[in-house]
Amino acid sequence: LHLQTPPTDLTEWKELISRIATRSKTCTIALVGKYVKLHDAYLSVMESLYHAGFENESKVNIKWVDSEHLVDQNCCAEELGDADGIIVPGGFGDRGIEGMIQAAQYARENHVPYFGICLGMQIMVMEYARNVLGYADANSSEFTPEGHHNVIDLMPDQQGVETKGGTMRLGKYPCTITPGTKMAECYGTLNIDERHRHRYEFNNEFRAEFEEKGLVIAGTSPDGRLVEAVEIPGRDFHLGAQFHPEFKSRPNRAHPLFKGFIAAALKYQSEHTPTDHPMSLGE
């Protein structure tokens, strides 16, 4: 066809390769999940952490932690004590949930940067309800359908739907970010679009109580009805997102939340020598 094609501009990729080759820092991120024996189950999250490391001039070591092993805070200290940040990705079903809640509590009480994605955000909310609001039985209706304090509940348009896969809130949806939040700082804008895959959401019946006890609603649907993200103020990074930011991260364009999370992990590391990391009560 004798088409004239312009020369390929590889400048951006050459700069990326240069950044990767000259990384001078290293941080350790504990990935707490139920499918950790098969790392590919979290491939997008894993790659997104690496992308964020590139932009922060850091290597990222991922420590794979089976949430079923985290039976109490002493176990958390043993498994998570050398981590510079803790991430809890998405998932379904009640297996390993209590261990994830233990991990979220450990992160909150020890000021370790925490990033909760989808289920990980719901875990963050349940932990806060149990240990800050005082609802010891706080849970999700996914796990305790008849629970009295289900701070995570089935979305209204999912009521009565029995099949999971084809009926979720799927795909890209807009989100309005609350000004002055860590989330706003990471994105640099107040209006974003992110990809979703869930049936359960933050239960607005408890929203006022959470806000009174200090939890910040960092992002909502444009009409304010759906809570899309929450965070604890005054922390370098303790944030949960109902959406899946890992689906939009790229090697040459790390997702803003992953970038902010790794930056916070590096800051935490710089402020804590190995002997300063939280230890178990027995040590």
Residue ranges of predicted features:
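N-terminal beta1-alpha1 cap of cysteine-dependent amidohydrolase-like domains
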Residues: L1-D236, P245-E283
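Active-site ExK catalytic segment of metal-dependent nucleases
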Residues: Q242
